[in-house]
Amino acid sequence: MAKRSGVEIRDLDAVRDMPAIRRIWREIGWASDKRAEKQIPVFYKAGSCSVAAFDDEAECAVHAIPGQMQFDKTLLPLCVIAAVTTSRIGRGISLAQRLTARELAKARQRGDAVAVLGMFDQGFYNKVGFGTGAYVNEFALDPASLDVAIKPRTPSRLTTDNSDQMLASLLARPPLHGGVTINIPSLYKAELSMPSDGFGLGYFQGETLTHFIWMDGDAEHGPYKLRWMGYRDGAELLELLALLKSLADQVYSVRLIEPPHIQLQSLLKRPFRQQAIAGKGKFYADQNAYAWYQLRVLDVSQCVACIHHRGPALRFQLAVSDPVDEILAGDDLWSPLGGTYVVELSENSSARLVEKGDECPDLPTVCCTVNTLSRLLFGVSPATSLAITDGLEGPGPVLQALDTIIRANPNPGWDF
């Protein structure tokens, strides 16, 4: 890894480093106005942050916050890499890579089982063990095309002063595999406060906000961007979609990520016709599937224990390699994750790291990187597919059995 003399790697000092952090955000275009810049210190009050400094001036920072991730029926402790920022003079010398690895090590020491991040593009974070997440669907649609027959009630207007209630509504959504939650009220309010044109509409039951939408966009006819949608059940979700449809008198286009509990296309009137007519321009109609996030396992045993298989037990050896083992070699923060595990998938699944020389030669062996293992365990892609695309190696019958055992289609349902 390339190094630069005089680089100090340390924890963030909020008082000393904040002017430099603000400067970096301006340089990379994340703080477009004073309103957004005002929220920067709020973000860094939560979680953990590592910085790389030249002459005591921070030039790169990696910020991690705690969360939870649903693995089938189990909630796992989660590390969210929330911000990776590098100044104009700090690029090309692997600072972000080193700091990200450092935050992963700290998260692993805290007991986090998995880490996630939103990627600016695919490839960079693979160097620290991340694998690409599952596809999500993004829609641009005319709200009038929503095929929802119910008539919504008159909603209440919401502002950032309702942020705690909105967060509680998000946390009350039905759990789903791969679902992420980040319960940090100050951080959520700061995020809502950054765009100057954000607004919310929602419904109360007494003092409780039961379901809501939060959007931004100040043009007369849109397009609006739907940022957050909280609900407790399907009936409330349908009312929110009906509420969105009611805006069609004035709003021509809304962009949104598909709500994770439904297939939105089935609730659109003639979607292909809409896309053909409005395929280009400001108010286009479109549907795209892509993976915007990545994930990586931090604790193999914790993750494997979440798999509950009622059929015949599947036992095999798992040989894993992890690039962070080399990046942080000799660092007391990190104990190697790579090695050989004896894995059993059953009603009480387990993965046990074995010492060299204690391997079980009678068991079939599956070999992969931690990047591929992360995609495998969370069901991003089946084992037989990963054998084609990601270098997963193992006997065909074992890979086919993994295809049927591991739950598929994780969906974070949360922007991070």
Question: Where in this protein do the model-derived segments appear?
Answer:
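Amide-forming acyltransferase catalytic core, primarily the GNAT-like/NAT-type
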Residues: 135-227, 231-238, 242-247, 252-258, ...
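A short, internal acetyl-CoA/4′-phosphopantetheine-binding micro-motif in the GNAT/acyltransferase core
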Residues: 81-91, 120, 225-234, 372
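Conserved acetyl-CoA-binding loop-helix of GNAT-fold acetyltransferases
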Residues: 86, 91-105, 234-245
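Short amphipathic alpha-helix that is part of the acyltransferase structural core
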Residues: 1-66, 73-80, 146-186, 220-227
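Conserved active-site alpha-helix within GNAT-family acetyltransferase domains
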Residues: 109-113, 119-137, 261-280
